[in-house]
Structures are given as structure tokens and as C-alpha cells.
């Protein structure tokens, strides 16, 4: 079933990373005020397109993003989407979501379960942004560690600054 599920590249995007955003971003220090700035900075410092995905996201940090938000149903109407360096693709259906994951260079999330496991199933580079105290539990579900990396958003209950998290992401992306 999965063998025929994900190989279409219906979007025709090339050389991109996917960052999936959900409620697990909410506990990152200064995310409501600073996330937009660091996403735009990252897009300038790497040689890849950034496609941000989210589904029905009503969180304040997400509402505060000024990055272009394109609903999946409208992406074909948005002719300049291929030229955008960073954009948000909202409410992507499951099949197309798998397609985005499969054709990416790197997938990043705060352990969005399905997203992480599909990325690892495809043996793709994956960054999981976790609280250090969650890592042991999460690792019970991670079998393919060859392409799996963790970046902490907190250690010993001390939140890590968003700037430090994005510096680590930038380093990993540029080392691909």
C-alpha cells in the first residue's frame, strides 16, 4: 500500500525541507514573538526552500506568523508558489502530506508522531525538537536512528532560546 502512496511529487517542489507545526511548538521559549523572525532568517541562510505545514492550527504563535499562508485547496491557483523561498501550506490531505514528506531533503517537527514516523519510514533526514525529559519515551517508538536527530527545546526544565534551536537547525541543514 505505501509503496504506491508517496512517489508522485505532485507539487513539483525541488530542494526543500518541511517543518510541520502543531501545538507542540507552544512550549518553546519566545515562540509567539520570535518564530517568524527565525524562520525568515533560516530561509536566507540555507540553500533550500522551506515549506511549513500545519493542520487547523489555531495557536497564537501560528497566528502571529506573517509568512504567506496558502490553503492546500488553493495552492494550484497560486502561480508564484514555486518561486517562494518560504511559505506555509495549510491543511494538506494525508496522501499529499506523505508526498511532501517523501520528496523532501529534511523533515522537522516537535515530534508530530505521524510526520516523524513517515519520515523515518522513508529513511529521510529527520529532526525532532523535544524536551530532554521526553526523549527516553519518544525513543521507545523510534527504530531507524540513522537519519534521526534530536534538538532540545529544554534541558532539565530550562527552556532553550529559539535562537539556539535555529542555529542547530541551520547547521544540520547546511551539513546535508
What are these regions (language model features)?
Residues 24-33:
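A short, glycine/small-residue-rich beta-strand->loop->alpha-helix junction that serves as a flexible
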Residues 116-176:
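Nucleotide-sugar donor-binding patch of glycosyltransferase catalytic domains
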Residues 9, 46, 79, 173-176:
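Short, flexible helical or helix-coil boundary motifs
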Amino acid at each position: 500500500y505505501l509503496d504506491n502512496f508517496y512517489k508522485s511529487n505532485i507539487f513539483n517542489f525541488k530542494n526543500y525541507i518541511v517543518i510541520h507545526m502543531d501545538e507542540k511548538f507552544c512550549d518553546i521559549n519566545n515562540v509567539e514573538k520570535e518564530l517568524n523572525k527565525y524562520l525568515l532568517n533560516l530561509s536566507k541562510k540555507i540553500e533550500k526552500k522551506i515549506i511549513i505545514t500545519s493542520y487547523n492550527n489555531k495557536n497564537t504563535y501560528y497566528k502571529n506568523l506573517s509568512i504567506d499562508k496558502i490553503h492546500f485547496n488553493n495552492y494550484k491557483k497560486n502561480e508564484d508558489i514555486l518561486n517562494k523561498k518560504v511559505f506555509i501550506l495549510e491543511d494538506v490531505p494525508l496522501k499529499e502530506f506523505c508526498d511532501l514528506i517523501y520528496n523532501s531533503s529534511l523533515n522537522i517537527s516537535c515530534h508530530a508522531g505521524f510526520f516523524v514516523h513517515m519520515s523515518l519510514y522513508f529513511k529521510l533526514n529527520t529532526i525532532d525538537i523535544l524536551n530532554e525529559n521526553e526523549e527516553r519515551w519518544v525513543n521507545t517508538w523510534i527504530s531507524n536512528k540513522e537519519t534521526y536527530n534530536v534538538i532540545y527545546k529544554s534541558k532539565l526544565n530550562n527552556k532553550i532560546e529559539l535562537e539556539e534551536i535555529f542555529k542547530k537547525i541551520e547547521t544540520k541543514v547546511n551539513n546535508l
